[in-house]
From Swiss-Prot:
Entry's family note: Belongs to the IF-1 family.
Xref: PROSITE patterns: S1_IF1_TYPE (PS50832)
Keyword Chloroplast annotated: yes
GO CC field: chloroplast; cytosol
Broad class of where this protein is predominantly found: plastid
Matches recorded under InterPro entries: NA-bd_OB-fold (IPR012340), RNA-binding_domain_S1_IF1 (IPR006196), TIF_IF1 (IPR004368)
Name of the protein described by the UniProt record: Translation initiation factor IF-1, chloroplastic
Entry-linked PANTHER family: TRANSLATION INITIATION FACTOR IF-1, CHLOROPLASTIC
Transmembrane parts of this sequence: none
Length: 75
């Protein structure tokens, strides 16, 4: 069953917190507290401050989310 009320956004990881939590600054300027999705955790993808990520947010609480993808940093 697919979740209906999800919002996708891209942002920059600004801070790494304990227990796999991260603070992400989205492109529209919102600060979000996020955690890593199970697929990223299973595949041991390393997320560091400064990485660009794709975040999934609930429509009910826009201050918390889940990191679903780490974007490549092409500077």
């Amino acid at each position: 069953m697919k979740k209906q009320n999800l919002i996708h956004a891209e942002g920059l990881v600004t801070e790494s917190l304990p227990n796999g939590m991260f603070r992400v600054l989205t492109d529209n300027g919102c600060q979000i507290l996020t955690h890593i999705s199970g697929r990223i955790r299973r595949n041991s993808v390393r997320i560091l401050p400064g990485d660009r990520v794709k975040v999934e947010l609930s429509a009910y609480d826009l201050t918390k989310g889940r990191i679903i993808y780490r974007l490549s940093n092409k500077s």
